[in-house]
Amino acid sequence: MFRGANAVSLDAKGRLAMPSRYRDELDSRCNGQLIVTIDAVDPCLCVYPLDEWEQIEAKLRALPSLREENRRLQRLLIGNAVDLELDGSGRFLVPPRLREYAKLDKKAMLVGQLNKFQLWDEDAWNAVSAADLAAIQQPGAMPDELRDLIL
């Protein structure tokens, strides 16, 4: 399980060092093999351990292919997916096209989302975090299924 928001930096080549607290789990789960693709909803990237991504692919493959919205989602997620591997220093290279999509420069945030990470531009992350907090505090903003969640 991946949790927490981690400030990370991309070097001049677009490499990012995976925080050390996640490296052992990624090494044991998937030998450091990752898939990075766009997030179809938010302006960020999703970084999956290979075993998690294979489950996503199976679900996408099972969708009826004659529905345009299914094909659209498949094109976005699978068409932008890139296989990556952590190097000996625990780094991975974010391809230029994906860096452009998420507007990643030097400062970024790697945010654990249980089964995957989201990779955000730091300023975009700060803005969406503030907006999310403001939205959830509005009366009636909490969905019914979350009202009974014990935190």
Curated annotation (Swiss-Prot):
The keyword Protease does not apply. Residues 5-52, 81-124 form the SpoVT-AbrB domain. It is found in: Cytoplasm, Nucleoid. It holds the Pfam family MraZ. Keywords: Cytoplasm, DNA-binding, Repeat, Transcription, Transcription regulation. PROSITE patterns: SPOVT_ABRB. CDD domains: MraZ_C (cd16321), MraZ_N (cd16320). Belongs to the MraZ family. NCBIfam families: division/cell wall cluster transcriptional repressor MraZ (TIGR00242). This is Transcriptional regulator MraZ. It comes from Pseudomonas putida (strain ATCC 47054 / DSM 6125 / CFBP 8728 / NCIMB 11950 / KT2440).
